[in-house]
């Protein structure tokens, strides 16, 4: 039997990068996946790729920074499928600048998507999970939440906040049958990262004890584990998937 057979999963930011890898892996393991993303073009390409392999997947254009949009998308999903079993809070953006140059808009944009978006999705979707007595919520943090990073005050603040949200929701929802955990990726070879100059990529690899960048599929595997029954007794944890950067 597949590990997520008959499960209904929402993956935010599922059109590209880590979310795309998770969407592919989750459908391969039997889940019906709802991709919530703003990028319709890439979302539909991911849907077509998954459907070609026989997976069950749907694209929904949702701005997770908008509570009203998340609430409406949640209601539509529950009306169609009866429930949502798994939430992967993966959507995120960057607006990098040093604190001296960072604008209030750059700060707020990242807060809205990376932190408020996690709250919006967790609040709307967890209500149904509590009612059913079952749920898995996995939030995407980052290793930079644990050690900081130059030029990313906004991003680091959100990813540290995600860990705090994760620990708090784990306490609030655990007794209701809902586990809440986080994954903190390190340097991952997404399409965007692979376009960086060779010297930058080399310096990133040198910081990793394993000597290489991670693959999106390796982060998706961490999501899959935490969403599966094998992780039923893991709650409030942050799993670093970083090749040993944080140890």
Identify the meaning behind each predicted range.
Residues 81, 122, 130, 134, ...:
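C-terminal substrate-recognition "lid" of short-chain dehydrogenase/reductases
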Residues 3-34:
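Canonical Rossmann dinucleotide-binding motif of NAD(H)/NADP(H)-dependent dehydrogenases/reductases
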Residues 40-41, 61-72, 104, 217-218:
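The beta1-alpha1 cofactor-binding region of Rossmann-like NAD(H)/NADP(H)-dependent oxidoreductases
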Residues 98-99, 106-111, 193, 200, ...:
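Substrate-binding pocket helix/loop in short-chain dehydrogenase/reductase
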Residues 122, 158, 166:
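Active-site helix of classical SDR
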Residues 142:
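Residue(s) in the substrate-gating loop at a strand-loop-helix junction
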Residues 93, 100-119, 134, 138, ...:
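Catalytic Tyr-X3-Lys loop
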């Amino acid at each position: 039997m597949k590990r997520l057979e008959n499960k209904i999963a929402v993956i935010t930011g599922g059109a590209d990068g880590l979310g795309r890898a998770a969407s592919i892996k989750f459908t391969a393991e039997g889940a019906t996946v709802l991709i919530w993303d703003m990028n319709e073009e890439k979302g539909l390409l991911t849907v077509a790729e998954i459907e070609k392999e026989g997976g069950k997947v749907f694209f929904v254009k949702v701005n997770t920074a908008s509570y009203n949009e998340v609430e409406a998308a949640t209601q539509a999903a529950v009306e169609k499928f009866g429930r949502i079993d798994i939430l992967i809070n993966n959507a995120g953006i960057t607006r990098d600048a040093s604190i001296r140059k960072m604008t209030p808009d750059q700060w707020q944009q990242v807060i809205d998507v990376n932190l408020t978006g996690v709250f919006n999705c967790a609040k709307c979707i967890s209500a149904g999970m509590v009612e059913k007595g079952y749920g898995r919520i996995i939030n995407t943090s980052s290793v930079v939440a644990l050690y900081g990073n130059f030029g990313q005050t906004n991003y680091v603040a959100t990813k540290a906040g995600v860990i705090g949200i994760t620990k708090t929701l784990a306490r609030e929802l655990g007794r209701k049958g809902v586990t809440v955990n986080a994954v903190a990726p390190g340097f991952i070879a997404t399409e965007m990262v692979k376009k960086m100059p060779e010297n930058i990529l080399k310096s990133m690899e040198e910081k990793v004890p394993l000597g290489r960048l991670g693959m999106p599929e390796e982060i998706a595997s961490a999501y899959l584990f935490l969403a599966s029954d094998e992780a039923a007794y893991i709650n409030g944890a942050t799993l670093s998937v970083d090749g040993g950067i944080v140890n």
